């Protein structure tokens, strides 16, 4: 198959803006080669993030505002795609497809025999019309309709691009939520294990915002200065989510700002650096426990991606707790840690346009492999 250009767009649970990746895809659906040609990170336009936070945190929002946000997020994503394509020196007519994840504002996995439901804002029709490029969006719903969690979806990229014949690998994403993909050496897609381990940056960022009014703990510097409070840590680690076996997924509804406020109240007697260290240790220890409880064995290598890959506290602690596994940032494996998820949605859009399935049933719990996403053709 001739090389194809595709764009992937995403905004994560932190709602801090949009990431875009322009990639070249060659090969077959079973063995694609994906090369990143350009990337772009943009903040949301003024006011849009606040409107999204209001909705994502469960506050009352009129239906008209939800509808307007569905349009406005799409227009912001379209502008991100247009800037990315132009800055990379290409024309929209050269792009085969855009994969737009949109902005998750609610994600409820299946529970107690009730079907799940999920909502990502950013209507692909607006993106297709604004760019003139075939756009695929609304990726998660089809997996849920097939009985799955609707998440995680990125492990298909991990499996196709990062599996190794000789070494067990974990790909550990550290976005707002932490999720792991376990790739057994030489294993097939039915052997992939992937799930959300719990919070990553959501609670750390929330703690820093509540205490200092700053957006996040840059480089983990505050956590590195603090001391972990064992009483708070053990109480927080008793959360039932950490004991629940996969497949499982979570989000801002469970580990969002309301939870950060509760943890801040419970740790208010501690110095700020100790609070941040303790919440950061919650991320680290919940990851370690998930590996020991739910993986066949500890991996030989762990590659970190997402914003938390730059957090010195998290990297150092994972390196110690998961030894002798080698812990490194995913760029050592040829994957930009800040844009892996954007790459994944470019790949998922390409798979959808070729008619190939995009989910891994062993990962999401779906009854079968299905094509993911709604297609909005160009023109």
Curated annotation (Swiss-Prot):
<dbReference type="GO" id="GO:0009254">
    <property type="term" value="P:peptidoglycan turnover"/>
</dbReference>
<protein>
    <recommendedName>
        <fullName>Anhydro-N-acetylmuramic acid kinase</fullName>
        <ecNumber>2.7.1.170</ecNumber>
    </recommendedName>
</protein>
<comment type="similarity">
    <text>Belongs to the anhydro-N-acetylmuramic acid kinase family.</text>
</comment>
<dbReference type="InterPro" id="IPR043129">
    <property type="entry name" value="ATPase_NBD"/>
</dbReference>
<dbReference type="InterPro" id="IPR005338">
    <property type="entry name" value="Anhydro_N_Ac-Mur_kinase"/>
</dbReference>
<comment type="pathway">
    <text>Amino-sugar metabolism; 1,6-anhydro-N-acetylmuramate degradation.</text>
</comment>
<keyword id="KW-0067">ATP-binding</keyword>
<dbReference type="GO" id="GO:0097175">
    <property type="term" value="P:1,6-anhydro-N-acetyl-beta-muramic acid catabolic process"/>
</dbReference>
<dbReference type="Pfam" id="PF03702">
    <property type="entry name" value="AnmK"/>
</dbReference>
<feature type="binding site">
    <location>
        <begin position="12"/>
        <end position="19"/>
    </location>
    <ligand>
        <name>ATP</name>
    </ligand>
</feature>
<keyword id="KW-0418">Kinase</keyword>
<dbReference type="GO" id="GO:0016773">
    <property type="term" value="F:phosphotransferase activity, alcohol group as acceptor"/>
</dbReference>
<comment type="function">
    <text>Catalyzes the specific phosphorylation of 1,6-anhydro-N-acetylmuramic acid (anhMurNAc) with the simultaneous cleavage of the 1,6-anhydro ring, generating MurNAc-6-P. Is required for the utilization of anhMurNAc either imported from the medium or derived from its own cell wall murein, and thus plays a role in cell wall recycling.</text>
</comment>
<keyword id="KW-0808">Transferase</keyword>
<dbReference type="GO" id="GO:0016301">
    <property type="term" value="F:kinase activity"/>
</dbReference>
<comment type="pathway">
    <text>Cell wall biogenesis; peptidoglycan recycling.</text>
</comment>
<keyword id="KW-0119">Carbohydrate metabolism</keyword>
<dbReference type="GO" id="GO:0006040">
    <property type="term" value="P:amino sugar metabolic process"/>
</dbReference>
<keyword id="KW-0547">Nucleotide-binding</keyword>
<dbReference type="GO" id="GO:0005524">
    <property type="term" value="F:ATP binding"/>
</dbReference>
């Amino acid at each position: 198959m001739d090389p194809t250009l595709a764009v992937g767009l995403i905004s994560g649970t932190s709602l801090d803006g949009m990431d875009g990746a322009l990639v070249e895809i060659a090969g077959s659906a079973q063995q694609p080669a994906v090369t990143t040609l350009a990337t772009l990170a943009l903040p949301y336009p003024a006011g849009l993030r606040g409107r999204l936070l209001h909705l994502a945190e469960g506050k009352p929002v009129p239906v008209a505002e939800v509808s307007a946000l569905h349009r406005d997020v799409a227009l912001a994503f379209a502008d991100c795609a247009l800037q990315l394509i132009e800055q990379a020196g290409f024309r929209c007519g050269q792009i085969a497809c855009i994969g737009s994840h949109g902005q998750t504002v609610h994600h409820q996995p299946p529970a107690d025999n009730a079907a799940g439901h999920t909502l990502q804002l950013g209507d692909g029709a607006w993106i297709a019309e604004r760019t003139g490029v075939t756009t695929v969006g609304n990726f998660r719903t089809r997996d849920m309709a097939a009985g799955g969690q609707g998440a995680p979806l990125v492990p298909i990229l991990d499996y196709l691009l990062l599996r190794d014949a000789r070494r067990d690998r974990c790909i550990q994403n550290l976005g707002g939520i932490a999720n792991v993909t376990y790739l057994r050496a030489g294993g097939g897609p039915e052997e992939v294990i992937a799930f959300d381990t719990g919070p990553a940056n959501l609670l750390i960022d929330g703690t820093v915002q509540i205490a200092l009014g700053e957006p996040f703990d840059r480089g983990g510097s505050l956590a590195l200065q603090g001391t972990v409070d064992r009483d708070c840590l053990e109480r927080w680690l008793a959360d039932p989510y950490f004991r629940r076996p996969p497949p499982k997924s979570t989000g801002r509804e469970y580990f969002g700002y309301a939870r950060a406020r509760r943890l801040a109240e419970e740790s208010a007697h501690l110095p700020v650096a100790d609070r941040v260290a303790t919440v950061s240790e919650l991320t680290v220890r919940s990851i370690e426990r998930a590996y020991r409880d739910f993986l066949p064995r500890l991996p030989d290598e762990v590659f970190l991606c997402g914003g938390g890959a730059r957090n010195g506290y998290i990297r150092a602690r994972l390196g110690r707790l998961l030894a002798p596994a080698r812990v490194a940032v995913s760029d050592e494996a040829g994957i930009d840690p800040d844009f892996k998820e954007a790459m994944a949605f470019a790949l998922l859009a390409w798979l959808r346009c070729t008619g190939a399935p995009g989910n891994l049933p062993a990962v999401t719990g779906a009854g079968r492999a299905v094509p993911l996403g709604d297609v909005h053709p160009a023109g």
